[in-house]
Design a protein with these regions (language model features):
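Solvent-exposed loop/turn and edge beta-strand elements of beta-rich ligand-binding domains
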Residues: 1-193
Length: 193
C-alpha cells in the first residue's frame, strides 16, 4: 500500500513538474512575441489663419538606427559610421541627433521605408523590432495654399509614456507652417511703360 501511495506521489510530482515547465516555456514565448511594436503618425498643422488642418499626403520615411541584441543597443550597418552619439537623451539632444542622422542618411543615399498620410492625416509603420528609429518627413505637404513641414525625430520601441512601457507608439509631429515664397523685389529694374 505504501508503494502505491509513493508511486502516486511520484507520478503527481512528475506531472506537476511537466505542467510547470510548460507554463514557463509558454510565458517565455509570449514575452518574446510581444517585443514587436509600431509607430503611428498623426499629422496636423496650423495654417496662416491659425486654424488646425489635417495634413493628408505627407510622406514620412522610417530608418532603423539601432536594434536591441542581448539587452544592448547595436548600430544598424548603414548608420554605424555616422559618428553621432545617442547617449544624451534630452529633448534638445534628440532633436539635434535626428537632424544629424537624417543629414547623414541623405549624404549617403540611405533610403528608408516611406508611407504617406491618408485623408485623416494618419500613417503607421508596423512590425518594428525593439530599437531606435529615425522618422523624417520627405519634402513638405500642401493644404490649400499653405505648405507644412516637420523636423525629423527619433522614436524608441518600446517608449516610456506616462510611466508605462509602450510598444505601439503614437506620434504627432509638429508640422510647421512654411510661409509662401515671395518673389524678390528688384528696385533697380525699370518697369516697362
Amino acid at each position: 500500500m505504501r508503494k502505491k501511495i509513493r508511486s502516486i506521489h511520484i507520478i503527481l510530482f512528475v506531472m506537476l513538474f511537466l505542467v510547470g515547465s510548460f507554463i514557463d516555456i509558454s510565458t517565455i514565448h509570449a514575452e518574446a512575441g510581444s517585443r514587436i511594436g509600431s509607430i503611428q503618425i498623426i499629422c496636423k498643422g496650423r495654417n496662416s489663419s491659425d486654424k488646425e488642418v489635417t495634413l493628408s499626403g505627407a510622406k514620412f520615411s522610417i530608418f532603423p538606427i539601432q536594434y536591441m541584441k542581448n539587452d544592448e543597443l547595436i548600430w544598424e550597418d548603414d548608420f554605424k559610421d555616422s559618428g553621432i552619439s545617442l547617449q544624451d537623451t534630452s529633448a534638445e539632444a534628440r532633436e539635434k541627433q535626428a537632424r544629424q542622422l537624417f543629414a547623414f542618411a541623405k549624404e549617403n543615399n540611405i533610403s528608408g521605408l516611406t508611407q504617406e498620410t491618408d485623408t485623416s492625416g494618419r500613417t503607421s509603420f508596423g512590425e518594428l523590432d525593439e530599437g531606435i528609429y529615425l522618422v523624417a518627413q520627405i519634402g513638405n505637404v500642401e493644404s490649400g495654399t499653405d505648405k507644412f513641414e516637420s523636423a525629423p525625430f527619433l522614436v524608441n520601441i518600446p517608449s516610456e509614456i506616462n510611466g508605462n512601457v509602450e510598444y505601439n507608439v503614437t506620434i504627432e509631429p509638429k508640422a510647421e507652417w512654411v510661409s509662401p515664397e515671395t518673389p524678390p523685389s528688384n528696385p533697380d529694374k525699370r518697369k516697362d511703360p
